[in-house]
């Protein structure tokens, strides 16, 4: 009798387990489908302790692949895989918490999981922790702990190539080099900076190549050598490398094999021509905190160096800093003066900024008509921000007659260049059926998803964007989601080919 009861319990548990497996999958696929059978087989392997099965199953619950997204089940299986040594399992948990992808958005929980991956030796999460301590993002700012994690990530054992999220050990080597250059947590040491930059530069990390080129130009940590400066600056200029690319110094040596008298003069002049763009790049990095710790004073210093050589982008950047009072006291007249210098050279960004100044009457008489004139000049150059501003103008009827079709046209042009505010605007239009278009949750989800990938909004705004994206996802069937992802990929390919997307890619590098 007792044996019979135990047997019944065992049979009942097996039945409940099978029903649970089916229920999990039936929300997406028929119970007798290959997909559901695959999920059941994988879960059985995972229950038996198979690390690979635990990782795959956890990833599917995190992503909503084959099964309904369930972050609690994702944690269950990925943590089991992590305990068996799968650092990537912990990385995935950190990633989903960090970006709110089917998980509650939580920087603190993301860092907890990233730390587990880092302690297992994952270089990308070691660098993420270094950044968190360096910038005080999720942890109290602590340069000593930042150094500790950067050193682990920069270890030669991590030099094999590209790793998750950050690039390679080269990125951490670069950050360590900058800390030595500025004496952050360590005594200032330009020679150590040069050593670290060379390691990263030789691994094709372009920020380090540029930094090393500047070091050779000024003789900081290395002997002054214009030939080496030209070589590394040329290697590091984003987009300069093409198949069959030959450095400028090699071209000079080939053309003048015996001429060494004038070589340093030639290299110096060549380096000077390149230097303005490099100085501007450093300004951008300091301004935004890309590759370097955010510092508006240092950003302004580098921008001024480049602007003194007539670089329009640097002139516009200084205008932005005066406009917003970053690193300097807010001064609309100074902003206008710098914008006009850049706009005279035809820079679309400066033309757009002059349009915004006119629209809001900052430093000049308010004029919607003048604003539209500046926006049109910049939009003719395919400048996404100007296209977006024209979309806003046609949407609200400021400076032009209100026109829903034109508003949608300009928003779409900007969005397809990767401009986040335009993508967000399209998401809202399709989600609520505005601007004369019918409500379309698939299109709304696509554009909100795009916007959430590279948003520069505040954390609160970003959370709202992600929440709306996830809400829309929940309204779509599996077939609709498949169609939506296919459409997303087509649009993304367009964006990836645009100039704006290249800027985003360099920013994220």
Task: Kindly give the residue locations of the regions a language model identified.
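Bacterial N-terminal signal peptides
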Residues: 8-18
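N-terminal leader/linker segments that initiate helical-solenoid repeat arrays
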Residues: 16, 20-59
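Hydrophobic face of amphipathic alpha-helices that form TPR/SEL1-like repeat modules
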Residues: 24-25, 56-63, 67, 92-99, ...
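Structural signature of tandem alpha-helical TPR/SEL1-like repeats
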Residues: 32-39, 68-77, 104-113, 140-149, ...
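Canonical positions in the second alpha-helix
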Residues: 43-45, 80-81, 116-117, 152-153, ...
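Short helix-capping/linker turns of helical repeat alpha-solenoids
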Residues: 47-50, 63-65, 70, 83-86, ...
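Terminal, low-structured helical/coil segments at or just beyond the last alpha-helical repeat
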Residues: 460-509
């Amino acid at each position: 009798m007792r044996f019979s009861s135990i047997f019944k319990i065992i049979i009942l548990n097996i039945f409940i387990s099978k029903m649970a497996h089916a229920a999990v999958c039936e929300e997406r696929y028929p119970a007798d489908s290959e997909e559901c059978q695959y999920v059941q087989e994988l879960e059985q392997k995972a229950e038996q302790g198979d690390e690979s099965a635990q990782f795959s199953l956890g990833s599917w619950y995190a992503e909503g692949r084959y099964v309904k997204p369930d972050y609690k089940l994702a944690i269950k299986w990925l943590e089991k895989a992590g305990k068996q040594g799968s650092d990537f399992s912990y990385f995935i948990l950190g990633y989903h918490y960090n970006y709110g992808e089917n998980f509650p958005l939580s920087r603190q929980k993301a860092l907890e999981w990233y730390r587990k991956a880092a302690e297992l030796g994952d270089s990308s999460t070691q660098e993420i922790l270094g950044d968190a301590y360096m910038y005080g993002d999720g942890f109290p700012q602590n340069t000593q702990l930042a150094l500790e994690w950067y050193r682990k990530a920069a270890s030669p054992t991590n030099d094999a190539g590209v790793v998750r999220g950050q690039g390679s050990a080269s990125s951490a080597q670069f950050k360590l080099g900058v800390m030595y250059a500025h004496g952050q947590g360590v005594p200032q040491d330009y020679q150590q900076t040069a050593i670290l930059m060379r390691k990263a530069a030789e691994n094709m990390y372009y920020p380090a190549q540029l930094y090393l080129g500047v070091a050779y130009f000024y003789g900081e940590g290395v002997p002054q050598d214009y030939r080496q400066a030209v070589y590394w600056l040329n290697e590091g200029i984003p987009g300069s490398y093409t198949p069959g690319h030959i450095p400028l110094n090699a071209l000079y040596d080939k053309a003048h094999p015996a001429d060494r008298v004038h070589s340093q003069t030639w290299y110096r002049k060549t380096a000077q021509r390149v230097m303005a763009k490099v100085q501007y790049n450093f300004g951008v990095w300091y301004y935004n905190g890309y590759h370097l710790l955010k510092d508006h004073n240092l950003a302004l210093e580098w921008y001024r160096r480049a602007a003194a050589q007539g670089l329009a982008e640097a002139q516009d950047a200084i205008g932005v800093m005066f406009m917003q009072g970053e690193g300097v006291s807010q001064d609309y007249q100074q902003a206008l003066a710098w914008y006009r210098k850049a706009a005279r050279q035809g820079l679309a960004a400066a033309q757009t900024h002059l349009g915004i100044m006119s629209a809001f009457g900052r430093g000049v008489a308010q004029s919607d008509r003048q604003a539209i004139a500046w926006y049109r000049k910049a939009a003719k150059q395919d400048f996404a921000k100007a296209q977006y501003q024209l979309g806003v103008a046609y949407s609200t009827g400021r400076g032009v007659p209100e026109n829903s079709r034109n508003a949608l046209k300009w928003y779409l042009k900007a969005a397809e260049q990767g401009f986040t505010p335009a993508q967000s605007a399209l998401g809202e239009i399709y989600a609520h059926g505005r601007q004369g278009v019918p409500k379309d949750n698939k299109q709304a989800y696509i554009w909100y998803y795009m916007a959430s990938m590279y948003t520069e909004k505040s954390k609160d705004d970003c959370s709202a964007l992600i929440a709306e994206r996830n809400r829309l996802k929940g309204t779509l069937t599996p077939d609709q989601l498949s169609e939506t992802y296919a459409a997303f990929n087509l649009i993304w390919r367009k964006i990836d080919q645009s100039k704006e997307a290249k800027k985003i890619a360099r920013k994220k590098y």
